[in-house]
Amino acid sequence: MIIKILDPSKNATYLWLPVYFYDEPFQFQILSSIIELVFYISCFHLMTISLYVMLKVQIFHRNLYILYIPMFCVWYGLIAGKLITIAYRLKFVDLDYELGEHIAMWTDDQAKMLHVSSLRGLELLIFGGFVQWHYMYTVVYGILGVAAERAIASVLIENYETNTQLYIPIALTIITQFLAISTSLSVLFHKASVFLSHLPWIISCSLGALAYLFIKIVNENFQKQITNPRRKRLFTISQQFQVKENLRALRLGTRLVFVVFFYVAFVSFGMFALAFDLVSSAYCHFVENFLFLNPYPICFTAMLTIPHWRKHFQNACFTWRLVKSAWTKPKTSTTSVEISTTKKLEAETDLYFRQLNESWI
């Protein structure tokens, strides 16, 4: 959605928001919003359970958690931004004009822009758009930050596990958040072109791929040395654990990369199809919600990849317990028979020993 602000001097200012509004009957908008809220609540449950399991069963280094957790937590802000959009869509926020249909991610067509003379009443919508941009770029830069942390851990293998200093994850978190916020503001206020807005994830993916190869080669080499009985280098227990941790993180990261690539490919195709009117505007609902519902494939992939996480996730997940209880055969009758049999044997045993005791008196 592009907002064009015309001041009295006829100078135009543009705002670029990643929000969508549809030209649909109001009843259908209510229905679609209810369906979206149901999926968001389910996704909220899944995300919360995943965070709980990751914090309860900590199988990675503390520094990795300091980088990972904020990336997951900003999803809650993303949903808050979406709820603001729904409030405007259902006209819970009163405006003096109609917002109209806005399904183009970016456009130069003046007819597809929202023309206003003031931002009065649009403050919440702008904030919601910023939150959504911030989430996207937090993930983009956050992945690069995680890759950098694992690369540093591979280089500083001598004492990284035993080092209690937090300056590395804190510095990486500050840098990634600074980049995410500054990039989000630049895109929001249209200080960056369409190409520049895509440049961060292109650079991050390229650097992340190089970091992935570096971490993989270095740690596989360490693993060969550890398993070699004739090795000349001595690896401490903490260093061996760190190598296994890096390889475990790579296995998890590889699966997540395929999931993210599928997501990016689907959304990119959807945006391309919408831009050239290859599909109807209703398809935009699916493209938009693919961003908000990304915890479904990501959390399931993460939770089911790590065996320790899988067990606790299945026990904590409400949906899993419902399915498990539905497919589990009731054992009430068998249990009652076993209990009655046990009590009968106990009574007979007590009677036997009482009779035996009395016979010796």
Swiss-Prot record:
Family statement: Belongs to the nematode receptor-like protein sre family.
Name this polypeptide is given: Serpentine receptor class epsilon-32
Annotated compartments: Membrane
Species, as recorded: Caenorhabditis elegans
Keyword Membrane: yes
Taxonomic superkingdom: Eukaryota
Record flagged with keyword Transmembrane helix: yes
Main location: membrane
Record membrane topology: Multi-pass membrane protein
InterPro entries: 7TM_GPCR_serpentine_rcpt_Sre
Transmembrane segments: 34-54, 66-86, 124-144, 168-188, 195-215, 256-276, 286-306
A GO term from the CC aspect: membrane
Keywords for this protein: Membrane, Transmembrane, Transmembrane helix
